[in-house]
Design a protein with these regions (language model features):
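Acidic/polar, glycine-enriched structural segments that form the non-catalytic walls/loops
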Residues: 36, 41, 46-237, 271-275
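Extended, loop-rich substrate-binding clefts of extracytoplasmic carbohydrate-active enzymes
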Residues: 14-45
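Stable alpha-helical elements in mature extracytoplasmic
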Residues: 176, 245, 252, 261-265
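Single conserved hydrophobic/aromatic residue that forms the stacking wall/gate
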Residues: 2-13, 277-278
Length: 279
């Protein structure tokens, strides 16, 4: 699930991070970019509910390489199983099951690229090194559909949320930005300075990042007992709650701002209880 830019095979093993400056970063709801000057790459990210979209613009004349590294771990994680494989001239699929914050964390992905790979090498079963012909200066766009259920659902998420856009990164970004504007327009602020209003809406944006949607576009999701279930149409299954410190203010605020979200969260928590008889 981690796409890391690298100059070649040697960096796959060294895993040396690329230097960057925070002054070269840009961030807004649904968008992030960083200019990796040392590597000669502009990396941009946007998203839909189940798909991550990458755009990499390489400086002309350098080797255009992407590393898909499913071996990458946080300090407290352990990989039970995982793999990456090529399933088309411009497509990769893969999965990983780990133990870390919780046990048995599944993630499946289908990644489609805006042009075929010039070459692909696999240093390990969970890594892929891709090269592209970018001599024309045309960027590489990558769409990554994810699911915690299976590969088929990851593909379905990818198709339903991005097929109508093709590989038009800017169009997806604009649609995502419009969705965020609707989310943030639930409160209208008057008065104060521009900096204070920016601070307020940034905090409101942060309040809407979690919990995460755990169900796929077909309604399927993986329960806490590892079985797969399907929710009724129109409802979302959520995960990644932090109720120990959100019950004081965040939850009361959501009962005022987003009752649909609150209802879905309550149903999600009840489902966790029913699947484990434990919260």
């Amino acid at each position: 699930r981690d796409l890391v830019r690298s100059r070649g095979l040697g960096d796959v093993y060294k895993r040396q991070p690329l230097a960057f400056s925070h002054s070269d970063e840009k961030a807004s709801p649904g968008y992030y970019s960083v200019n990796l000057r040392e590597a000669g790459v502009l990396a941009e990210l946007t998203t839909t509910p189940h798909v991550g979209i990458h755009r990499y613009t390489y400086k002309k004349g350098i080797e255009s390489t992407l590393v898909v590294d499913m071996d990458h771990l946080l300090d407290n994680e352990y990989i039970y199983e995982g793999w990456v494989k090529q399933t088309g001239e411009n497509e990769l699929t893969g999965m990983r099951r780990t133990r870390g914050w919780v046990d048995n964390q599944y993630v499946f992905f289908v990644a489609q690229f805006s042009q075929p790979f010039s070459s692909m090498e696999q240093p390990s079963e969970r890594q892929a090194v891709l090269t592209f012909d970018t001599t024309t200066g045309k960027p590489i766009v990558c769409k990554v559909g994810v699911s915690i259920v299976n590969e088929e659902n990851a593909r379905l998420n990818l198709e339903q949320e991005t097929d109508s856009y093709g590989f038009d990164f800017d169009a997806i970004h604009q649609a995502t930005r419009s969705n965020w504007e609707k989310e943030l327009d639930v409160i209208t602020v008057e008065g104060g300075t521009e900096a204070e209003r920016t601070n307020f809406y940034t905090a409101l944006y942060h309040s809407k990042i979690i919990p995460n949607i755990a169900s796929d576009v077909n309604g399927q999701y993986r329960r806490h007992d590892m079985s797969v279930a399907t929710i009724p149409a129109g409802r979302r299954q959520f995960s990644t709650f932090s109720t120990w410190d959100t019950f004081r203010a965040w939850h009361p605020m959501m009962t005022l701002l987003d009752t649909t979200l609150v209802n879905d969260m309550v149903q999600s928590l009840l489902d966790m209880y029913l699947s484990l008889i434990h919260i």
